[in-house]
Amino acid sequence: MSQKRLSRVIYPGTFDPITNGHLDLIERAAQMFDEVIIAVAASPSKNTLFTLEERVEFARQVTSHLDNVSAKGFSGLLVDFAKAEKANVLIRGLRTTVDFEYEFGLTNMYRRLMPGLESVFLTPAEEHAFISSTLVREVAIHGGNVDEFVPAIVANALHQKKKI
């Protein structure tokens, strides 16, 4: 039986902001797959700290050392983006059982909307398991130091946002 190689994958998220935990998963996915597309969701229902353009640019800059990684913004359904990009695999990070419950439901919905779409789940490195964009934003908004949780360019942007 021949196996089809999973060569083009999507790592979707809001990435507001992209964290060291995200970057760890991206770097690991880049070693496993031929091409990784970071799909930055517009998420109009969320009150994001950074614009879609800023979030895409952060993703591009922090992954510039990875030749097989690109970042693109999208709005609408993720499955439509996956079809347009000719990708049939999603990379998702799982930090806790709560993440698993949520992702399990999403995976089943995605399969209904796009038969053949698979999800590959990666667990974070131990040092990143507690990091979330929400927590990083909260710490930054209240004047805390987030330098160890996000890439330097993102930390600088968060420090600038505090001054506004």
Swiss-Prot record:
Recorded name of the encoding gene: coaD
Top-tier EC class: transferase
Nucleotide-binding found in the keyword field: yes
One of the record's GO cellular component terms: cytoplasm
Key word Magnesium present: yes
Cofactor dependence: Mg(2+)
EC number: 2.7.7.3
MF terms in GO: ATP binding; pantetheine-phosphate adenylyltransferase activity
Protein name in the entry: Phosphopantetheine adenylyltransferase
Pfam families named in the record: CTP_transf_like
Record-linked CDD domains: PPAT
Predominant location: cytoplasm
Gene3D superfamilies reported for this sequence: HUPs
Family: Belongs to the bacterial CoaD family.
